[in-house]
Amino acid sequence: MESDGGLSRYQKLEKLGEGTYGKVYKAKEKATGRMVALKKIRLEDDGVPSTALREISLLKEVPHPNVVSLFDVLHCQNRLYLVFEYLDQDLKKYMDSVPALCPQLIKSYLYQLLKGLAYSHGHRILHRDLKPQNLLIDRQGALKLADFGLARAVSIPVRVYTHEIVTLWYRAPEVLLGSKSYSVPVDMWSVGCIFGEMLNKKPLFSGDCEIDQIFRIFRVLGTPDDSIWPGVTKLPEYVSTFPNWPGQPYNKIFPRCEPLALDLIAKMLQYEPSKRISAKEALLHPYFGDLDTSFF
């Protein structure tokens, strides 16, 4: 048994960034030369952070080609290291590096995102922090979901959850308006925002605080009322004096977009969570009709 918990089997190469609860390094497995991502977790006084334990248990439960693989867990002194497969870059960095994404690549990335999500949701796991930075891609065109730090097993009936989830720009309106009971539709809203960002090459709703985020959504999609979204006026953060914006047609929001893409994104950005398309349903949408899915 190695005194360092097995850490000496890996050579750290460079720091990749900060995750939900610790630093992430690119490293090489000395014996095989395989590149890995090492996620270093600071152990709290009472042991392993609950977010880390959640990620470990969920990822071991969810082996799927569109979910980042967890190879190993190393315990070294007062630190825990998660050893993940390494991918070249994330979707955010890639989008920043190109003038535009070609329509077929958008379709492929969206399909793979939905595949990983449908699988996770099928295992009753919400991701809750979907954003381009958490979607890893490789040079072969594969896309995988990463950073399940906020992920949560869904219990039925829908439980009361914290609403401090998801980077503001990708946060579902029911969460922004203070709903504490929510389920898989929160992830589908985030997918709609990511899809829109790939189509327009800029974030769909880039608010700088919660009320700004709410207003940005309302300006684009219209201010919802009980006729559009039954029960919205009873949510804790809903205010009857919200400005009444009419909303814009989807072909104006996404001017260079094919009609089937507009139809799919409209189904993802439904205000009423129960009317929002599921990942499983979205995979069957005719938008993907011309995509060669044998690759996935």
From Swiss-Prot:
Activity regulation, per record: Phosphorylation at Thr-20 or Tyr-21 inactivates the enzyme, while phosphorylation at Thr-162 activates it.
PROSITE patterns in alphabetical order: PROTEIN_KINASE_ATP (PS00107), PROTEIN_KINASE_DOM (PS50011), PROTEIN_KINASE_ST (PS00108)
EC number: 2.7.11.22, 2.7.11.23
Keywords: ATP-binding, Cell cycle, Cell division, Kinase, Mitosis, Nucleotide-binding, Phosphoprotein, Serine/threonine-protein kinase, Transferase
Record-listed Phosphotyrosine modification sites: 21
Catalysed reactions, as listed in the record: L-seryl-[protein] + ATP = O-phospho-L-seryl-[protein] + ADP + H(+); L-threonyl-[protein] + ATP = O-phospho-L-threonyl-[protein] + ADP + H(+); [DNA-directed RNA polymerase] + ATP = phospho-[DNA-directed RNA polymerase] + ADP + H(+)
Protein's name in the database: Cyclin-dependent kinase 1
Organism: Dictyostelium discoideum
Gene: cdk1
